[in-house]
Amino acid sequence: MGYYSLTEVTAVQYAKEHGYFEKKANVVCHEIGDGNLNYVFKLDDGEKSIIIKQALPYAKVVGESWPLSIKRATIESKALQIFAKYVPEYVPVVYSHDEELAVTVIEDLSRLTITRKGLIDGEEYPLLSQHIGHFLANVLFYTSDFGLQSEEKRVLEGTFVNPDLCKITEDLVFTDPFGHYDTNDYEPELQLTIDELWSDKTLKLKVAQYKYKFLTRKEALIHGDLHTGSIFSSPSETKVIDPEFATYGPFGFDIGQLIANLLLNALSREEEQRGVLFFHIEKTWSYFVETFTKLWIGEGVEAYTKEKQWLPIILQNIFTDAVGFAGCELIRRTIGLAHVADLDEITNKETRIQAKKQALSLGKELIKYESKNADIQLFRTLFQQTVSGGIKA
């Protein structure tokens, strides 16, 4: 029959045909996805529920003028299964994957809240940083040359060649926000700030280097789009979802993207409400370092993991990359395609424009920052300097 797009009616038919519900079951189906690339349906018969996710052959956020390969659904399914191999507690269960229809049937996580929405609403997730730090350390270590035999790593790397979605990252994170491109989207009040950004040759040279790292450093399997909208949370649970951008890339990429999105939420808050965001930024890194170090010592398979001075160099390189990638993400989410609700839903226009100018300023400082001795306090320091007016956009 070939590929066809599901509807709420045909999603139920599909689920029944594949044994997820009895033929006579009264199944309620709703499309619940608010993402940019896929259909997501929730199906519930009153006793059990599932999620059906289908990749579209184009970017939903733009339309059929932006075609995309549906093979990304297979990438996502395989990534979730790789993640589950190392940290099953932090990902949804994958029940099945249909490559022809680009359909994945997965665990329903509606008991949890999308972390971005929860943070905007002021909810607190005390275990978020611990869980994400552990998730990142395990996945990045075990899919790298340090935790995986080189032959196995090369084979796995070939499984995650993801040209369509990597091209989106190349363009929307590293290229378009730094010049005159049609994909950019911003308020006229930001134009002067943006003109200064685009004319900053030192900044562009640094962005070029981070883009090159993304293109060439195949260090570990990365989620590729790890923001607070790609995480479900509750006070006791954390689940990472939507790894359709998964590919082999730099260790620091996912870390930087996550930190940037926590910073964006911090910019949307009053000063006295920001502490929890910096707690999560700093604890994510400390849990990552702690777990990665334990794995390096106990599970390292590469010969030079026995050299005591090698690990500190690796960790410093990861941190340096995370700083720059965070800066790129801050700018992209402010003036590029696919904004974040943290800033866009600030109701007072003057406050919203000010927060966006601060996001651009902070992003620029993170990209241009150069120090081999910086630690995780850097984010708090530069943030405070930015919002207090010590750094101008």
Swiss-Prot record:
Q: Does the keyword Cytoplasm apply?
A: no
Q: Which SUPFAM superfamilies match?
A: Protein kinase-like (PK-like) (SSF56112)
Coiled-coil segments on the chain, per record:
none
- Signal sequence span is none
Q: In which pathway does it act?
A: Amino-acid biosynthesis; L-methionine biosynthesis via salvage pathway; S-methyl-5-thio-alpha-D-ribose 1-phosphate from S-methyl-5'-thioadenosine (hydrolase route): step 2/2
Domain of life (superkingdom):
Bacteria
Keywords of the record: Amino-acid biosynthesis, ATP-binding, Kinase, Methionine biosynthesis, Nucleotide-binding, Transferase
Please name the GO terms of the biological process aspect recorded for this protein, alphabetically.
L-methionine salvage from methylthioadenosine
Asked if the Swiss-Prot or TrEMBL record annotates the protein with the keyword ATP-binding, the reply is: yes
Pfam families linked: APH
Which residues does substrate bind? Answer: 225, 332
User: Which transformation does this protein catalyse, written as a reaction?
Assistant: 5-(methylsulfanyl)-D-ribose + ATP = 5-(methylsulfanyl)-alpha-D-ribose 1-phosphate + ADP + H(+)
* UniProt: ATP binding residues: 38, 53, 107-109, 242-244
Q: How does it assemble?
A: Homodimer.
Q: Which protein family is named in the record?
A: Belongs to the methylthioribose kinase family.
* Main function: Catalyzes the phosphorylation of methylthioribose into methylthioribose-1-phosphate.
The name this protein goes by in its record = Methylthioribose kinase
